[in-house]
């Protein structure tokens, strides 16, 4: 799966790997010998993948990537070990207000921490899906597809997390219920193909799981060379939807729910 959503003009994956370097951006940061304390703007998530810092910006619905020099400067800033030249290397992040000056030192936001995946929770052959589950798999994907096309990703994530909080976690018959739901999604993939729709499918399954008292995580991941993004749902270390053989190739950048 090469994209994180099925968007058209606002697709997350339409933003190519963006070299944020010292010469990007029109506004200069102050040329002080040391960087002031900074924090990451709200809605910004990051990870280190293949030696580079990659950002997922929920407010802008896009991914971006730092140059090697900016990556090193960013990591030093997070450790409170900035060098004089780092102000120039991070100038673009400051100009774009991805880094926001703060009055005093605060703990640096860490990248997503999610349990490493070890396999798919449900394996073929799937149980025969029921008609109600098939209907929910179709209507759920159609509904989330509309939201993905018309709403900001930050809004979608907030809605998902509100729904998850309203449900009481339950483990009774969880594996069996997940197998039934996963079977329904597999069955309808003949006319709602999985390719380039990983975000919609993961959102729809996540919502159905929460409706049945099961609390999975919605995870976004990235890989480099070439840049790819993926989205999946997982419970503990098991992938519910998104295919373990693909998921294991991606570095998690954000997790919700």
Predicted regions and their residues:
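Long, charge-rich, low-complexity alpha-helical segments
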Residues: 2, 49-52, 59-155, 160-167, ...
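N-terminal secretory targeting and juxtamembrane "stalk" segments of secreted and cell-surface proteins
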Residues: 2-27, 32
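Long, low-complexity, charged/polar intrinsically disordered regions in eukaryotic proteins
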Residues: 24-51
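Short aromatic-centered micro-motifs
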Residues: 57, 233
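Residue-level recognition of alpha-helix initiation/capping sites
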Residues: 84-85, 200, 224
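Secondary-structure boundary elements
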Residues: 124-197, 201, 207-210, 234-235, ...
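Short, well-structured beta-strand/strand-turn elements
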Residues: 212-225
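A short, glycine/Asx- and small/polar-enriched loop/turn
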Residues: 226-230
